[in-house]
């Protein structure tokens, strides 16, 4: 493959940036990896096979892309910063199995790209070092659009990874935990110190693996309503589940109907949202869906 030295070293990274006169944009959360051991752990954590396809988001100068291209059948990478396209074309020129797309992945036609770039029936995984500022929107788009990914392995802010994988009753548990775990099994894999990036971010990162479920974690009457219910339940963590639902879901006039739904779901109205499991939220969502519709 590539006869050049690996991209993810301090010397090579600096040489690439200097060669192309590239300056980092803070607004795009650009932090480049300079540790090959961490890259190896990301690739290992993702668990893809050599015949699989990879979607990468935010390839930067190609450090992770290069390692993915060595082991996967094909890598399709979305880069929002047009200044990086010629850099990537240079650093990844030895890898014919890499396709760079200049696009914001949040606005891209992902189904169309997957159909065009990968073989029918080919297993596809997402592997990415995501910018902190756009982590949640990207992850939720990938999950909510129900694209045919087997897994999503991402390096993200450690605190966000903990929130996504959190269990009921923990201080990290919240709406993001339920939203992500509804679609996927979440497992933190590797803690990554800030020192392996150029420039160094202010916080540590974590590699998180989301293994997509064949069917959602819980079954509900109305999925959008379910999401509305648990989001409302976490609006104010100091309030009880009853107060949060009254103030953030249906209004004071619906208090009696909400109390009835809580009773039907077997949930104490004095509990707080962070103590409810996804299964309890599913029961509550269905009960609220029925009682509030009757009250209308």
From Swiss-Prot:
GO terms for molecular function: 16S rRNA (adenine(1518)-N(6)/adenine(1519)-N(6))-dimethyltransferase activity; RNA binding. One of its GO terms (cellular component) is cytosol. Its EC number is 2.1.1.182. Belongs to the class I-like SAM-binding methyltransferase superfamily. rRNA adenine N(6)-methyltransferase family. RsmA subfamily. Gene3D superfamilies: Ribosomal RNA adenine dimethylase-like, domain 2, Vaccinia Virus protein VP39. NCBIfam families: ksgA. SUPFAM superfamilies: S-adenosyl-L-methionine-dependent methyltransferases. S-adenosyl-L-methionine binds at residues 31, 33, 58, 79, 104, 129. Pfam families: RrnaAD. Specifically dimethylates two adjacent adenosines (A1518 and A1519) in the loop of a conserved hairpin near the 3'-end of 16S rRNA in the 30S particle. May play a critical role in biogenesis of 30S subunits. Keywords: Cytoplasm, Methyltransferase, RNA-binding, rRNA processing, S-adenosyl-L-methionine, Transferase. It is an enzyme of class 2 (transferase). It catalyses: adenosine(1518)/adenosine(1519) in 16S rRNA + 4 S-adenosyl-L-methionine = N(6)-dimethyladenosine(1518)/N(6)-dimethyladenosine(1519) in 16S rRNA + 4 S-adenosyl-L-homocysteine + 4 H(+). PROSITE patterns: RRNA_A_DIMETH, SAM_RNA_A_N6_MT. This is Ribosomal RNA small subunit methyltransferase A. It comes from Shouchella clausii (strain KSM-K16). It is found in: Cytoplasm.
């Amino acid at each position: 493959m590539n006869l050049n030295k690996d991209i993810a070293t301090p010397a090579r990274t600096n040489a690439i940036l200097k060669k192309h006169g590239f300056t980092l944009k803070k607004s795009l959360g650009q932090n480049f990896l300079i540790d090959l051991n961490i890259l190896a752990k990301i690739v290992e954590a993702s668990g893809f096979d050599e015949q699989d396809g990879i979607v990468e988001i935010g390839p930067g100068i190609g450090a992770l892309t290069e390692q993915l291209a060595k082991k996967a059948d094909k890598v399709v990478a979305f880069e929002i910063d047009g200044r990086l396209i010629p850099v990537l074309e240079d650093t990844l020129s030895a890898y014919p199995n890499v396709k760079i797309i200049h696009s914001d992945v949040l606005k891209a036609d992902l189904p169309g790209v997957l159909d065009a770039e990968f073989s029918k029936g080919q297993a596809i995984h997402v592997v990415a070092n995501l910018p902190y500022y756009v982590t949640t929107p990207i992850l939720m788009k990938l999950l909510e659009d129900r694209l045919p990914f087997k897994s999503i392995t991402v390096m993200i802010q450690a605190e966000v990874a903990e929130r996504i994988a959190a269990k009921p009753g923990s201080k990290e548990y919240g709406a993001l935990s339920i939203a992500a775990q509804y679609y996927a099994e979440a497992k933190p894999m590797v803690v990554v110190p800030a020192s392996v990036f150029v420039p160094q971010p202010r916080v540590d990162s974590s590699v998180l693996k989301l293994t997509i479920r064949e069917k959602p974690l819980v079954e509900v009457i109305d999925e959008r309503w379910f999401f509305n219910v648990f989001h409302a339940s976490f609006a104010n963590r100091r309030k009880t589940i009853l107060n949060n639902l009254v103030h953030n879901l249906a209004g004071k006039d619906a208090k009696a109907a909400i109390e009835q739904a809580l009773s039907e779901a077997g949930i104490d109205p004095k509990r707080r949202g962070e103590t409810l499991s996804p299964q309890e939220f599913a029961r509550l969502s269905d009960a609220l869906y029925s009682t509030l519709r009757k009250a209308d």
